[in-house]
Amino acid sequence: PAVQGNDKKYTMSSVLKVSAADWKTNRFYQCQAGYNLNDMVESRFETPKIQEPNITALVPSVDFISSQNAVLGCVISGFAPDNIRVSWKKDQVDQTGVVLSSKRRTDNTFETISYLIIPTVNWKIGDKYTCEVSHPPSNFRSMISMKYQEGEKSSCPSGSPPGTCPPCSLTPELLYHTNLSVTLRNGEKHQYKCD
């Protein structure tokens, strides 16, 4: 039933319940409202798309590896809806990282960054760090491992065939002097702000 507000205008709501199977099958739902059939207002709803994320590792550039702490990161992009989980491990031991709030991109997918601050000495002696990412809506689960090697930076997705992820060709850089400004090797730049 319609409800009259303080401004003497009436408000009415309607709810459509659909099964999960129908929700996944149909891309659009429409709602029409009005006083008569010739003067209806229509609203159209698009079901949210489900898209799994891309993960890119961020490791210290050689210019910034001499400081007391190093920052490792994961850029997680292109996922929808906004429901992402990230965890960090050092040689299978849980670590406490930071996950920033997701940003909506122009294509209605989302991106975020997670980072872990570690002692530079641990990075230089070759400890292995792993960023684990899961996206429940798409059943996506993956990890990317990072390990320092003298003279090069290596970072390959877990399970990559040998020779498909050569060091220095795919690894982006995290530039510490701008904190959360990320420049990838292809020149693409991302700016992240802490909330």
Swiss-Prot record:
Top-level taxon of the source organism? Eukaryota
Annotated S-S bridges: 74-131
Listed transmembrane segments:
none
- Give the CC-aspect GO terms: extracellular region; immunoglobulin complex
SUPFAM superfamilies according to UniProt: Immunoglobulin (SSF48726)
Annotated Ig-like C1-type domain ranges read: 53-145
Task: Write down the glycosylated positions.
Answer: 54, 179
Primary location: secreted
One Pfam family name is C1-set
Describe, from its UniProt entry, the tissues in which this protein is expressed. Answer: Expressed in pancreas, spleen, epigonal organ and at low levels in several other tissues.
Instruction: Give the coiled coil ranges.
Output: none
Q: What GO biological process terms does the UniProt entry carry, in alphabetical order?
A: adaptive immune response
UniProt keywords, alphabetically: Adaptive immunity, Disulfide bond, Glycoprotein, Immunity, Immunoglobulin, Immunoglobulin domain, Secreted
Intracellular or extracellular location(s): Secreted
Name of the protein: Splenic IgW, short secretory form
Instruction: Name its species.
Output: Ginglymostoma cirratum (Nurse shark)
